């Protein structure tokens, strides 16, 4: 699984079925797909049929402007996605740096079920193997140097 901030500009219809979403120029999902494809190539494994990457978010409102999205979220009755209750083989965090308005949302991921948590720490140019704190910088995929993340995921996949 991967945990971002919010769906940004991506748009999806409300549905109980798997459907294609309109990315509206949002780059997170294609970037995540490419990272995982490259990790599978690096460890010389085929991507299993019907596999998927669970994308979780701090909150689930679509808005490319994070400040607007936070305001909408604060005034909404938005629910947390029930997928957050699953057990994940590993979780990669890409929610960015410190933002006091997001701290409570980040805190709930301290209880998420996974044996392996990691994020790219660009300040130290390394992978950290823990859940990032509210003040840690968990590098977003935008302008991310992907090679360290690809290497790390490929080792998990072996």
Give the predicted meaning of each segment.
Residues 103-158:
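C-terminal capping/extension of enzyme domains
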Residues 52-57, 91-94, 117-122:
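A structural signal for short, well-ordered beta-strand segments and their strand-loop junctions
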Residues 1-86:
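A polyanion-binding, active-site-adjacent surface
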Residues 90-103:
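Acidic beta-strand-to-loop metal/phosphate-binding motif
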């Amino acid at each position: 699984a991967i945990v971002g901030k919010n769906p940004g500009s991506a748009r999806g219809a409300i549905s109980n079925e798997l459907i294609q979403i309109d990315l509206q120029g949002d780059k997170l999902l294609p970037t995540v797909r490419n990272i995982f494809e490259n990790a599978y190539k690096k460890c010389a494994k085929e991507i299993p049929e019907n596999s998927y990457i669970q994308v979780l978010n701090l909150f689930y409102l679509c808005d490319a402007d994070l400040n607007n999205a936070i305001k909408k979220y604060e005034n909404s009755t938005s629910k947390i996605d029930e997928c957050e209750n699953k057990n994940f083989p590993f979780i990669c965090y890409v929610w960015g740096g410190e933002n006091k308005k997001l701290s409570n949302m980040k805190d709930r991921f301290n209880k998420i079920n996974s044996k392996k948590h990691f994020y790219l720490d660009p300040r130290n140019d390394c992978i950290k193997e823990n859940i990032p704190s509210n003040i840690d910088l968990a590098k977003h995929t935008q302008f991310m140097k992907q090679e360290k993340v690809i290497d790390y995921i490929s080792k998990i996949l072996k």
